[in-house]
A protein has these predicted regions:
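Sequence/structural segment immediately N-terminal to covalent heme-attachment motifs in c-type
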Residues: 60-83, 96, 111, 117-118, ...
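Histidine/lysine/aspartate-rich catalytic loop segments that bind and position anionic ligands
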Residues: 79-105
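Short, flexible turn/loop "capping" segments at secondary-structure junctions
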Residues: 91, 116-117
Length: 180
């Protein structure tokens, strides 16, 4: 039992005409767990074109998950607010583009998902490391970051606008840069 006839990985073979023991996958086979039932969810594309929108409802939980995953995978290069001023570029590596440029603010969500999946320019692909559900969560958080850095007073709900001009509550912590 201990000495069964077998091939070691990538060992040569006299049995097959190509001389390889490792066999290519049969066309049309799908690995267990890899069956795609929603192409938009898996690729960010509809009918082969980068699409906009999300394949699921955007919720607070989704954005919070995206924030967590963004901090793990993205902030080192893209910075905490998506401005491209992360720790890696500060050490001399190429700076990624800011998410707050007009080009990326108007890019489709499918484009953002596709770049995260397949890489672009100096950015490596993360498709094998981040599952599609987390990539969509990161895209939702990226959209929230974009809104946070480009919002106007008109974007604030009327019920919350009064809070913008209200003086801080007694005993509240001072704003950044304020005195104690």
């Amino acid at each position: 039992m201990a000495n069964q006839p077998r091939y070691d990985p990538l060992e040569t073979s006299d049995f097959f005409a190509d001389g390889m023991s490792a066999r290519p996958r049969i066309a049309g086979t799908v690995a267990r767990g890899d069956l795609s039932t929603d192409p938009f969810f898996d690729t960010g594309k509809i009918d082969g074109k980068l699409a906009d929108g999300f394949p699921m409802a955007v919720s607070r939980e989704l954005i919070d998950r995206g924030h967590q995953r963004y901090d793990i995978y993205c902030s080192q290069c893209h910075g905490r607010i998506g401005d491209g001023n992360g720790m890696i570029p500060s050490r001399g590596f190429r700076k990624p583009p800011s998410f707050h440029t007009q080009t990326l603010r108007t890019a489709t969500t499918g484009h953002l998902f596709d770049v995260m999946t397949n890489g672009f320019g100096a950015m490596p692909p993360y498709g094998s490391m981040i599952p599609p559900s987390d990539r969509w969560a990161i895209v939702a958080y990226m959209r929230a970051l974009q809104l946070s850095q480009n919002a106007t007073v008109g974007d604030v709900p009327p019920a919350d606008r009064a809070k913008l001009d209200a003086p801080p509550a007694a005993g509240a912590a001072p704003a950044h840069g304020g005195s104690h």
